[in-house]
A protein has these predicted regions:
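Alpha-solenoid helical repeat scaffolds
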Residues: 1-7, 16-529
Length: 529
């Protein structure tokens, strides 16, 4: 009868009949149907009435608790939701409590007042925080809620409490990794201590990635080497290790690690493994190409899965074709990329422009970007690329105008400050202003090797050779790069350390033999490697 009323357009009457039947029969399916009908009719109070009746009639049914909690949150009755959460956790079997506690931040995510949500959850989990079997999970959840509320000190304290409750629990360490950038003083020693022992491979990998971002590459290498030794079947460990070795110019070691990743990933049915496989194969192709092994590079690219990122794959293929002297084919590969949305269309434009810029087709790159920017005039990625093209075209006023607009729109982004400062330094003009801009960039990203390179270069232009040498050596150690090698070698040469300069330039050639800055610098000093 209730369903007939619903079908005939009287959902209210149908709801009442079904709820009455549920009360008489104590049938959970009827209670759930009543709740669903009320929710479909956007009647939160009726849904809550049905869920509470369900809980009263069938107290052992935990599904009713879940509905009550979610409905109360939808009605923004946060304090009542906290009480419902406490009851819900308490009534679950012990084996299910930690998983339920871990899901709480997701359940409370829609609450607008994050501080109230965090306070409510901590109060609701009071018993779980004191119980040894649930304390680590509960403190982790409290920490996540405090983090989302912007209460960093409380999030840090929750992390410590969770770690103290159970040193083997992964939750507090995952939370610590998420807080490491915001609270390095507190989280760095905690993580370093934890990583001395045995941890899940995902956690050690996360810590290694954190170290790479600092950048503390030597420490990251140590963590990745241990990860590979302890978990040789963990494919992602080999991938990240190989990519880091490639980035630091250790190509033979990088190839060995990436080959191991390919072996593991190709044997896996995991879809996520295919993403890593594509990245590894493209990196192997790039290394083979750099060493002049062009047919081997083609073989690696031929193995890339069909569902790989089409823009990344096309870019790698175009780069290989370019090195083979097949420029028009390379350009066509990029032009034929199919895009499904605005974001992909922008990425396509950017890789096309970068290819044109690197191959000295600057007017074509400028025209391409101008057309794209008529459709997306506010796109900061397009603006950044336009600034680089303008610099190559020696349209310095237009370049500066674009970069200053970027500074206004993204004052927390160091790259526009660095780009303008470096351009001024490279042209040996307005050096005091260049230093100010680069110093501002370095405040925003103090560990960025490319910004350290820029500051070293402006110091050199200002005649501060000792400062320049120290900055450039630090930058090159952190990020071996052909352009940084060009700058460091020039400083060494001018300071009379010509043997050391030659060694640095040769190392730069191994990294990227066709780097314009490096080639021009060696030519200017008549250096023959």
């Amino acid at each position: 009868m209730g369903e007939l009323n619903v079908r005939s357009g009287s959902p209210g009457s149908g709801f009442s009949i079904i709820l009455d039947a549920a009360r008489k029969t104590r049938d959970p399916a009827l209670f759930q149907r009543a709740v669903d009908l009320a929710l479909q009719s956007r009647s939160g109070e009726s849904a809550l009435q049905a869920a509470q009746a369900w809980k009263s009639a069938v107290p052992e049914n935990t599904e009713a608790n879940r509905y009550i909690l979610q409905i109360l949150l939808a009605l923004n009755r946060v304090d009542e939701a906290g009480k419902a959460l406490s009851v819900s956790i308490r009534e679950l079997p012990a084996a299910e409590q930690n998983a339920a506690i871990a899901s709480v931040p997701r359940v409370f995510a829609r609450v607008q007042d994050k501080k109230t949500a965090a306070d409510t959850v901590e109060k609701a989990l009071a018993a779980a925080l004191k119980q040894s079997s649930t304390a680590a999970a509960a403190w982790t959840t409290v920490g996540r809620m405090r983090r989302e509320a912007g209460q960093l000190a409380l999030a840090v304290e929750a992390t410590r409490q969770g770690r103290a409750a159970d040193a083997s629990a992964p939750g507090p360490l995952i939370l610590a990794l998420s807080l490491a950038n915001a609270a390095p003083t507190e989280m760095t020693p905690l993580l370093a201590q934890a990583m001395k022992g045995a941890v899940q491979p995902e956690l050690r990998l996360g810590y290694a990635r954190h170290l790479i971002g600092l950048p503390q590459q030597a420490e990251a290498m140590q963590q990745l080497a241990r990860l590979n030794a302890e978990h040789p079947s963990f494919a992602d460990g080999w991938l990240v290790h190989g990519l880091l070795l490639q980035e630091t110019g250790k190509l033979a070691e990088a190839e060995q690690k990436l080959r191991q990743h390919v072996t593991l990933a190709q044997a896996s049915q995991d879809k996520e493994a295919q993403t890593g496989l594509a990245e590894a194969l493209m990196a192997l192709a790039q290394m083979a190409q750099r060493q002049g092994q062009l047919s081997q590079a083609e073989q690696w690219l031929a193995q890339v899965p069909a569902d790989a990122d089409p823009i990344k794959l096309a870019s790698r293929r175009a780069d290989l074709l370019t090195q083979q002297g097949r420029l028009e084919e390379a350009r066509q590969v990029l032009a034929q990329i199919k895009t499904n949305n605005t974001e992909q269309a922008t990425r396509k434009t950017l890789v096309q422009s970068m290819w044109l810029r690197e191959n000295k087709r600057l007017d074509e790159a400028y025209t391409l970007l101008k057309q794209a920017m008529t459709e997306q005039p506010q796109n900061t990625d397009l603006m950044s690329e336009m600034a680089m093209v303008n610099e190559k075209l020696k349209r310095f006023d237009e370049m500066e105008s674009v970069l200053r607009e970027l500074m206004k729109r993204k004052p927390e982004d160091p790259h526009a400050f660095n780009a303008l400062g470096y351009s001024l330094a490279d042209r040996n003009t307005r050096l005091d202003e260049a230093r100010q801009l680069i110093t501002q960039a370095l405040k925003l990203a103090p560990d960025d090797a490319y910004i350290q390179d820029s500051l070293g270069w402006v110091a050199f232009r200002q005649g501060q050779y000792a400062e320049a040498l120290q900055l450039l050596q630090t930058a090159f150690k952190a990020r071996p790069d052909a352009e940084i090698a060009a700058h460091l070698g020039e400083v060494l040469w001018v300071m009379g350390q010509r043997q050391e300069a030659g060694a640095v330039w040769r190392e730069g050639l191994l990294l990227k033999a066709d780097n314009d800055t490096l080639v021009e610098t060696m030519k200017r000093f008549q250096f023959k490697p």
